[in-house]
From Swiss-Prot:
Keywords: Calcium, Calcium channel, Calcium transport, Coiled coil, Ion channel, Ion transport, Membrane, Mitochondrion, Mitochondrion inner membrane, Transit peptide, Transmembrane, Transmembrane helix, Transport. It catalyses: Ca(2+)(in) = Ca(2+)(out). This is Calcium uniporter protein, mitochondrial. It holds the Pfam family MCU. The selectivity filter, in which calcium ions are arranged in single file, is composed of two acidic rings separated by one helical turn along the central axis of the channel pore. Disruption phenotype: Mitochondrial calcium uptake defects. RNAi-mediated knockdown in neurons and mushroom body neurons, from third instar larva to pupation stage, results in impaired mitochondrial calcium entry, decreased synaptic vesicle content, increased mushroom body neuron length and field volume which lead to decreased intermediate-term memory after conditioning. Does not affect olfactory learning. The lineage of its organism: Eukaryota, Metazoa, Ecdysozoa, Arthropoda, Hexapoda. It comes from Drosophila melanogaster.
């Protein structure tokens, strides 16, 4: 009986010994759970690589911010709104981070940066998820919209970029409202001061132009008086010639000849006058109106005399046009009704300055 009891105790001890060993082994393996995961799920040639980059408690805190998407060989993260790509370079098997600009950088720039950092890269290409190569002109912004892969020499690295926030229509409306408020605040604080400063500036420019125009105005006044005298003389001379014609026709009709003879003569005289008026229209492209004829003669005489005394009419007209624009703008700024309106929305458009095209057209016909 005692022998049986001793045998049972020995068997029980032998039964407990491997269980105790297993317990100790399990406790030893629990000290490194990452290593346990590598032993059970990874092949032997990746064991050393995984042990080199096993995460610690501090790395866990960092991973909360970086959040790699496709493992440790390559991943994309956003730092201060800008994408940063971390890639393991093949030559020294080191991680290298590249800061990318979504709009100004493209795929060609990314590949050039990879080759510049590692001279051992012979072939590099970017492939989309359908296996089609992406052109070098594709922007980084478009590239990061979907998953892709980078082929470096004989390795293919898959990348799943994190989703980024895009601008929506509602956010644009909010930005527009903020801009309106800022514009109203700027107008309330600065428009009055700006208009006063602009008014003083226009007044100074107008004063300078008037000082420059003063001697030219005197010469132009002399030329205008001379042209007016010539035009007035031509007007009265035309009336005198018509009176002489009337007297000659009357003399020939009632004294020298009879009406039967002079009737066809007066007809041809009248028809000749009509032909002269039509010839005037063919030359000037304007109807023969007394006021237009007088103005045309005045302009011709003025330009002819200005050329004789070397008066620069083009420069004078340019100064007058600038002066008219300054006066118009100054009047518009000082008008309380039109103070905050642009030039094409003013309520009073009287006495607007002539444009350069209108001046050229008028000069062409005169």
């Amino acid at each position: 009986m005692s022998r049986n009891r001793a045998a049972m105790v020995s068997a029980f001890r032998l039964f407990l010994r491997p269980a105790t060993t297993t317990t100790h082994r399990s406790l030893a393996l629990r000290l490194a759970p990452g290593t346990t995961f590598a032993l059970h799920l990874r092949p032997c040639h990746e064991l050393q690589q995984h042990r080199s980059f096993a995460s610690t408690a501090e790395d866990g805190e960092t991973d909360k911010h970086k959040k790699p998407t496709t493992g440790e060989d390559i991943y994309v993260e956003y730092v201060n709104g800008m994408p940063h790509m971390t890639v393991r370079l093949p030559s020294r098997n080191e991680l290298c981070q590249f800061a990318l600009k979504p709009i100004s950088h493209n795929v060609g720039d990314l590949l050039a940066m990879l080759r510049a950092e590692d001279r051992g890269i012979d072939r590099a290409a970017v492939i989309n998820k359908h296996g089609v190569r992406i052109a070098s002109s594709c922007t980084i912004e478009s590239l990061l919209d979907d998953s892709f892969s980078i082929q470096i020499n004989n390795r293919t690295l898959d990348v799943n970029p994190p989703k980024r926030d895009k601008v929506t229509l509602e956010s644009m409306d909010k930005v527009g409202d903020v801009r309106k408020v800022i514009a109203q605040l700027y107008e309330a604080f600065n428009v009055g001061e700006y208009q006063l400063e602009k008014s003083n500036q226009l007044a100074k420019e107008l004063e300078t132009l008037r000082y420059e125009l003063e001697p030219l105005e005197e010469k132009k006044l002399e030329l205008s008086k001379k042209a007016a005298r010539r035009t007035n003389f031509m007007t009265w001379m035309g009336l005198g010639l018509m009176s002489v014609q009337f007297g000659i026709l009357a003399r020939l009709t009632w004294w020298e000849y009879s009406w039967d003879i002079m009737e066809p003569v007066t007809y041809f005289v009248t028809y000749g006058t009509t032909m002269a008026m039509y010839a005037y229209y063919c030359v000037t492209k304007r109807e023969y109106m007394m006021e237009d004829v007088k103005n045309r003669e005045f302009s011709l005489s003025l330009y002819r005399n200005a050329k004789k005394v070397q008066f620069d009419v083009e420069h004078y007209n340019e100064l007058k046009r600038k002066s008219a624009e300054l006066e118009y703008n100054l009047r518009r700024i000082n008008d309380p009704l039109n103070m905050q309106l642009p030039s094409h929305l003013v309520r009073t458009q009287e006495n607007t300055p002539p444009t350069l095209t209108e001046e050229k057209a008028e000069r062409k016909y005169t």
